[in-house]
Amino acid sequence: MNDLCADIGYKSINHVGEQLCGDHVDIVEQGDGSTVIVLADGLGSGVKASILSTLTSKIISTMLAAGLPIEECVSAIAATLPVCSVRGVAYSTFTIIHLRNNETAELIQYDNPQVILIRDEKNFEYPRTEMNIGGKKIFKSVIKLQEDDLFIAMSDGCPHAGIGMSYNFGWKREDIAAFMETICVAGYTAKTLSTILIDEVNKLYGGKPGDDATACIVRIRKRVPMNLLFGPPSNRDDCDRMMSLFFSKEGKHIICGGTTSSIAAKYLGKPLKATLSFERSDIPPIAEIEGVDLVTEGVITINRVVEYAKDYIEANTEYAEWSMKRDGASLIARLLFEEATDITFFVGRAVNPAHQNPDLPINFNIKMNLVKELSECLRKMGKHIKVSYFYGVRNHEKIRYQGAVPQVQGASRGRARRVEPHAA
């Protein structure tokens, strides 16, 4: 079984003075375990470029995902794109990375900077075949994937950075490759790598980008399962069953909540060791149970993780905060955002009497909403999510399972796609 998966992340900066980005990235997951990633760069900048790039990426990704050949995609783009009233042309460059079951990558490139492949921590020169489709020179490559392969797709705003300032002729492709070689060894996620690259591009522009710039990074890695337990079941008789299912799962185990951790400690026959050292005044301290990878408080900690997750899939400005700190929320964020690819939530639906105080901004619905929000954010990152809710039912014991959270529509900012379904 292929246990590789693709961690996909991207970031863009706009041309100075523009509200919209003229680059667009679209990602479509296919039912056969394949993924189509399209980075399009519209002619010029601003609204017109945004329309051109969005149409291009949407048309190509949708048609390729449906199994249509690239020739038909290019013809459809030529017939669909609106013509620029100033230049008299309809034009958008594009880069396509088509991952087939995470075994091979098909690269199709038209007028964007050539995709960089970092393999074994070095810039790897791969073969390219030239095609002529509708008068357009298009390059195609087919590459067999290896673990730790790193694909770097860019719009031309990246190599143009620093022209006339730091560099006479811009930040050349080989210089960008050398820069990425030095940081890829740190094991950063694709989202973090794209953020580092675009931040460097922005510096070379002196904080005033002369063009839209986008970096989309695909990192090939092994699948990593992880399990998070949040709250006890509403039926006390289901505690042992819930714990048995939770601890039988492959991967690391995270427990959130005071009552939940006490039940887990009793089930394991191990002491619950609370720590009184506050890493942060606004996040409760963590605890320890032998056999459990991380034990934290519940609602307050998870609420902060949700805040981090929302920022991570957008601007990723809070990375420096949670990537280094040792509080419960930061530790959970690192495990879920950076390490895990397949995450199973075990959610108990017991009502905590302490949360029924009308003076507290915490109630049962907030707890359930936190699970929903976090699950949706993680899916936007490309994680494979399964949520199991534990209900108590009169006259008989029953555990009700809710399957994977529905796919959230819209392009994501950071994704890590699984290869095979994660068994319940």
Give the location of each predicted region.
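Acidic loop->beta-strand submotif enriched in PP2C/PPM serine/threonine phosphatases
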Residues: 18-31, 125-163
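Catalytic core of PPM/PP2C metal-dependent serine/threonine phosphatase domains
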Residues: 21, 52-121, 138, 190-218
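Conserved beta-strand-loop-short alpha-helix elements that form
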Residues: 33-45, 109, 144-167, 218, ...
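Short active-site oxyanion
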Residues: 103-104, 248-253
